[in-house]
Amino acid sequence: DQYIPYRDLFGGVLNEFHLFDRLYGLPEVDEAGLNQWLRIMQLDHKTSFVDGRFTNIDLSTGQKARLALIIALLEDKPVYVLDEWAAPQDPEFRQYFYEVILADLKEAGKTVFVVSHDDRYYHIPDRILKMEYGQVVDIETAS
């Protein structure tokens, strides 16, 4: 087969997601690598990953979204879709996400679709797709 099923290409965090203290559906997970992601996402003071479990998942909405993103990134997909992911983040982490994390994902060769209404960061993406009523009405390319 020369075609890859589309589900193998995409990962993401959509508006509704569920967290569990264990990881399901992932092959062997490197605890040190996962704990490094917790540091990057500024969650290492709230939880850690020990013996195949998160020590705490009683987190704020923004922190839960960060943990969900870490889990999605562990799948190592080439394309990610993040639906209003940054909305529940505090202002400092939201800026860090747009300016650092997205740049790191781009450098790693990942394609990331970020659904956002936050125009403070519209200068960051390579392209902006404007949509109205579910239809693309304009595509802007970074200058």
Residue ranges and their predicted role:
Residues 61-82, 96-98:
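GG-anchored amphipathic helix commonly corresponding to the ABC/SMC/Rad50 NBD signature/C-loop
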Residues 12-54:
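Conserved "ABC signature" C-loop
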Residues 82-90:
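Walker B catalytic motif
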Residues 53-63:
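Conserved ABC ATPase signature
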Residues 101-118, 122:
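Conserved catalytic loops of ABC-family nucleotide-binding domains
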Residues 6, 96-101:
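Conserved hydrophobic alpha-helix in the ABC-type ATPase nucleotide-binding domain
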Residues 117, 124-142:
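H-loop (His-switch) and adjacent beta-strand-loop-beta switch element
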Residues 4-15, 113:
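ABC nucleotide-binding domain signature
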